[in-house]
Amino acid sequence: MITHQPEWLHTFIRDADRRRRRRRRDDEFVAVWVRQTRDVAFEAEDALDDFLHRAGRRGRAARSRPGCALGWWPGRCAGEVALRHDLSGRIRQISKRLEQISDNRATFNIERTPTPAWAFSCCSSATTLAAWDDLEEYTVGLDKDIDKLKEKLLDDAVTARAVVPISGESSIGKTTLARKVYQSLEVRSHFEIRTWTALPHKCRAADVLRDIHRQMNNQLRRAASRQVPEDACDGAAANTRWPSGKDVSNQLYKSMTGRRYLVVVDGSITVTDWNSLRASLPDEGNGSRVLLITDSAGLEAVGHDGPMYKQIEPARLSQEHTYEVFRRRVFGRGDCPGRYRSRYYQDVFRITRGLPLSIVVLAGVLRSKEMPAEWDEVMAQLAPAREPHKKGGGGGGGGGSSSSSSNGRRIMSLAFDDLPHHLKSCFLYLAAMRESTPVDAARLVRLWVAEGFVRPRRGSTMEEVGQGYLKELISRCMVQLVDKGEFGAVMYVAVHDRVHAFAQDEAQEASFVDSHDSTDVVAPATVRRLAVLSSTTDRYVQLSNALPKLRSIICDLAEGRNRGVQYSDLGFLHASKFLRVIDIKGLELKKLPNEIGSMIHIRYLGLQCGDLEKLPSTIGNLVNLQSLILGGRHAMEVTAAFWRIPTLRHVVAPLALPSGALLGDLHSLQTLHGVHPRGWHGGGGNPLARAANLRSLELSELTADHAGALEAALESLDLLVHLDLRGDSLPASVFTVPSLRRLQSLMLWGAVDAPEGPGGAEDAQYIRPNLTRLSMWNTMVKQSFVDMLAVLPNLADLALMADAYDGDRLAFREAGFRKLQKLKLGLQKLEEWTVGAKSMPGLATMMLCRCARMRMLPEALAGMKELEEVVLYSMPDMVGRIEEGEGQDHHKVKHVPVIQTIYC
């Protein structure tokens, strides 16, 4: 009864809120009714959480008094009775308030507002999810602008660094246009370095420079043979001390010198910030470009003495192009039935007025609706937005920008109304993220799970269900897909600035989340979720008052500055005993306070703070913890009690992993990254026997002494999909252990114990049927080992780096690597590389890194018709061999659209 009360009240709120949204926005009676009902629901939630908190505290006190069970038991029973009595009294008071609210509804004649039929039609699993990844950024109507932009970026007549501006009203398609050109083969081939920076609200020049510097380093690191592989442990960004102030400006200038670069800046920029950016980018007359996507204010800021092309201004879509974008979003390769086509397409054009964002959001609603009844109801809902087409209104639907903004707002409101309730919460949560900036999908889903937004579904993990939620939001065009992995998972998403502003307004009105862009936070004591997204010079958080009702805090501060400031101790959270989510990035933090152990409701603890070096012993008291995500430069210790928390799902932290005897029942654990084994020496059975549901495992500091325990562990991990092993001695049996049949991604960093190939290697194609991605560093394998890799049936991405191969002659066998699409070789000792006939028939990208001794390219490259990109990193002799004219290897790669050379 007690646990069902908050759920029933939240259902009551959903009904009340739906009625409010169906009425006029100025209906104060309904607004008061919804607000009071929500307050009652919050009170019920507080009462239940307080009961659980006090009961948990009493339980810990009882366990800390050994040897006095008989004397302690009567008092404990009396205490529990008192707790339950207190909770029952609070629930009775809440029920009385609810009755008063219901009476007021009758008094003021707040009647039920019928819900339209279309609001119940949500076929997420069938229509929307099936097409979530078929939503490419269509550039219908932008062909002329694309050609203009390419011409300006690739213009050999202007060798000086030049600015290419794109401007226009919000949601007109500026970013879509720029990204299409940015990703084109011609641009990728022309520029050695390409960076893209989206400017969040109140961003500073140092943030822009730091982001450009980081992207440039990442591009060079992906090509170079470094001591750290490109896919470093989660939280690697937090481990890096990025320069600040003048240091980052000087380092960026130095690193960019000698390179032709394209720097894209997406957002409004001030004069001061533009001057800082311009001074940090060298102008060497090599045709470098700065592509600026901005508004009129941003254009005024960039006026300078250097070359600047005439701005490109995308127009609204014409009626014909509006039809085409809408058709593709709703019907894919099909089309609207002929008898409805003219009618609905005219409606869509009048409602959206040719604005691409409005078109795709409306399409996201209608793609799951039945035609014609539900379509008619949706169109009727937007009927007030219709106005006669005005002549001279531009390429699109005419009307002023304010009218278009109002129409776009109405469409977003309707799309939000159409979301199922659980997706409403997931969408509003995006108000706590930065706008127009990539958001890690795995982190977002883990936060949703911790908040309780994700509903369990038989046969699927909570994370898989959460990924489904995210895909549905993408399909509905409420969220933008930035990147997806090779295994079908969403990797990064973003939210358009207008959609983000809408989400923040809705979240604020519903008391869902309180967002601040300053570290000096003035928030009401009743706030339940707090987001601090600051780009100021401060790396602390100052609260004006205690927040006893706080459930979640998301803090994203700028990194890499003010290293001399006083460290935080999270004292501002001591009064927030109901916290469920702590997600903090950039805070100056060395250790967690002992008081963290009393916050027993915490489910997600994420601290991306590079100086973090100590965890308190009380962290083992967090009996509801699901995710521990730590990014730091220091290895940390945790008590054995931590490893016995049964709710653990994701541990990404530099921790020591004890022997299996000290591990509890970790049946929920799916992710274990960054840990190093301790107590695994000399066998001792299977150390991960109680974590058999692991999907992703990353271990470091492995030695030969760990071999027995590691192999025993791998034999029990039937569900493992990703494996990353690093150390002095790695077992080659990872290719032959039958239990790892689901393994898709494998990274090995260190010498393998059987360089010729493990026993049973002849069956590798059957034992590793799903292995898609393989990266090997310093493994020192022999030719026979490579021959084994060649028969893997689904290997699509292969990297052999930094002494991964032991020898100066490497051969890819005939008809081997049938599914390989991406190859990366960084073998400094390699002199001769031969490729057999019909080998790598689908190869699309080849990267050669510092293979300075390689005498020539394989002749077989000339016949690889799918090859789209060749990258040569620090290989000047090979660059000469592929030059047109006298290059002896030019004929082997002359058919490749993109050939990129990078020097270090």
Locate the predicted segments by residue.
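A conserved switch/coupling segment of P-loop NTPase cores
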Residues: 183-190, 242-317, 396
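Cross-kingdom leucine-rich repeat
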Residues: 253-256, 261-262, 284-285, 518-528, ...
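N-terminal flanking helix/linker immediately upstream of nucleotide/cofactor-binding cores
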Residues: 97-172, 176-185, 189, 200, ...
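A short hydrophobic beta-strand->loop->alpha-helix junction that borders the nucleotide-binding pocket
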Residues: 194-203
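Regulatory and partner-binding modules of innate immune sensors/adaptors
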Residues: 68-170, 176-182, 207-210, 290-291, ...
